[in-house]
From Swiss-Prot:
It comes from Arthroderma benhamiae (strain ATCC MYA-4681 / CBS 112371). Belongs to the WD repeat LIS1/nudF family. One of its GO terms (molecular function) is dynein complex binding. InterPro entries: Dynein_regulator_LIS1 (IPR017252), G-protein_beta_WD-40_rep (IPR020472), LIS1_N (IPR037190), LisH (IPR006594), PAC1-like_LisH-like_dom (IPR056795), WD40/YVTN_repeat-like_dom_sf (IPR015943), WD40_repeat_CS (IPR019775), WD40_repeat_dom_sf (IPR036322). The lineage of its organism: Eukaryota, Fungi, Dikarya, Ascomycota, Pezizomycotina. The gene is PAC1. This is Nuclear distribution protein PAC1.
């Protein structure tokens, strides 16, 4: 049998073993081995011993690191192969061209740096190419995501800025931010992001803030309502015009981490450290929990309400013969938890799917506007894409999307345009053309992520 090592390699190995034994005060064993190998003292003087003293440990750790790298690469190859198995040249081409099928790919278009601490939240302007980022460094930064340039830094909070959101009535878009300093602040983008109002009322850190969309049933100030979640276990609804708290929602028994409004503004979905998710009907005079969802084994970090475009993919899981009407909201929801799992729920509070794959806390969720996919980010540094048409199968894993934990994820909101008048539809009176009630929806294929590495990454088509 031919030797595996060359004579020189064998000699280096022997000297490394002897040096290791000597360094660990196993002198008798070292001398015995040296004698059996016929290495005299001249061939293994103090200089040689010093040279080989740590070589064995270095070789060993190198092998371990290499083995870990090989396992990681094998895992990546497996994920890529799975993606290829589910794709054809036609579907890949269509995915690149069709916004409803677009999936982000590495590398990011921009990796934006300026923050001096963890980025906690990102939010896109509903019309312009601006994106806001909130950080533990107590600042908000406004970027141009198309150019990859920093536009301005907003200061005002005295502690970490936890969440940001753009919203408000058409023509009066505002930026809302919330902080560990117990306050919510409103900033005016049309006036150099001047702080126009500060909302105070929570008794602990404010962990999430969201504008409630236009069309909230029963809302007197539709388009000017704001929802917030706090460590004080409550949710609050605010009038952005006056800064007054209109309602306080009690029900959670621990820190409320996240809140998400339905597209019509009728419902709020909330979740937190009591490991539950609650769906609230805020259209009634005395809002109360409509549904409470139990099932996670650890604190919940995030939640999202599915768009109506996803109903066709999720309704078969409930046994429905046809999906609910698009006008119906909060039919399906998703939650992400520190138990490393994502759960998909229906409006009755039934868990339809449990998605497993992340190796650490799940920090943020975003449904694809096209409805077919759900995206998630985690402390395991990955961004994952789950295909709802395949019962939540993970079809893409973007590994090392950030250098450290990924804390936030946001999809740029679609742009809604009034449908133009055209040939065909008539209201039957004098042959006048009738304008469609359905606005034209333009999906923006842009995703932003932020993390503990203090970087804001932009993935765009």
């Amino acid at each position: 049998m031919s030797p595996i090592l060359t004579n020189r390699q064998a000699e280096e190995l022997h000297k490394s073993i002897i040096a290791y034994l000597t360094a660990n005060n196993l002198l008798d064993t070292a001398n015995t081995l040296r004698a059996e190998l016929n290495l005299n003292e001249d061939a293994f003087d103090p200089a040689t011993a010093k040279k080989y003293e740590t070589l064995l440990e270095k070789k060993w750790t190198s092998v371990v690191r290499l083995q870990k790298k090989i396992m990681d690469l094998e895992s990546r190859m497996s994920a890529m192969q799975a993606e290829l198995d589910n794709a054809t040249p036609t579907s890949l081409s269509k995915r690149n061209k069709d916004p409803a099928s677009w999936i982000p790919t590495a590398p990011a278009r921009h990796a934006l740096e300026s923050h001096r601490d963890t980025i906690n939240s990102v939010a896109f302007h509903p019309i312009f190419s601006s994106v806001a980022s909130a950080s533990d460094d107590c600042t908000i930064k406004i970027w141009d995501w198309e150019l990859g340039e920093l536009e301005r830094t907003i200061k005002g909070h005295t502690r970490a800025v936890v969440d940001v959101d753009f919203g408000g009535p058409r023509g009066g878009i505002l930026l809302a931010s919330c902080s560990s300093d117990l306050s919510i602040k409103l900033w005016d983008p049309s006036n150099e992001y001047k702080n126009i109002r500060t909302l105070v009322g929570h008794d602990h850190s404010v962990s999430a803030v969201r504008f409630i969309p236009l069309g909230a049933s029963g809302a007197p100030s539709s388009g000017n309502l704001l929802a917030s979640a706090s460590r004080d276990k409550s949710l609050k609804i605010w009038d952005a015009n006056t800064g007054y708290c209109l309602r306080t929602l009690q029900g959670h028994t621990a820190w409320v981490r996240d809140v998400f409004p339905s597209p019509d503004g009728r419902f709020l979905l909330s979740t937190g450290d009591d490991s539950t998710a609650r769906l609230w009907d805020i259209s009634v005079s005395n809002p109360e929990t409509k549904v409470t969802m139990f099932g996670h084994d650890h604190f919940n970090e995030c939640c999202a309400i599915a768009p109506s475009t996803s109903y066709q993919y999720l309704s078969p899981l409930t046994g429905l013969k046809k999906p609910p009407p698009a006008s119906s909201t909060a039919e399906f929801m998703a939650t992400g938890s520190r138990d490393k799992k994502i759960k998909i729920w229906d409006a009755r509070g039934t868990c339809l799917l449990t998605l497993a794959g992340h190796d650490n806390w799940i920090r943020a969720l975003a449904f694809h506007p096209g409805g077919k996919y759900l995206f998630s980010v985690s402390d395991d540094r990955t961004l994952r894409c789950w295909d709802l048409s395949q019962e939540g199968k993970c079809i893409k894993v973007m590994r090392d999307a950030h250098e450290r934990f990924i804390t936030c994820l946001r999809w740029a909101p679609s742009i809604f345009k009034d449908a133009p008048t055209g040939n065909g539809a008539s209201d039957g009176k004098n042959g006048d053309i009738k304008k469609s009630d359905s606005p034209e929806v333009q999906i923006r294929c842009v995703i932003a992520t932020g993390g503990v590495d203090m970087k804001l990454r932009i993935f765009a088509n």
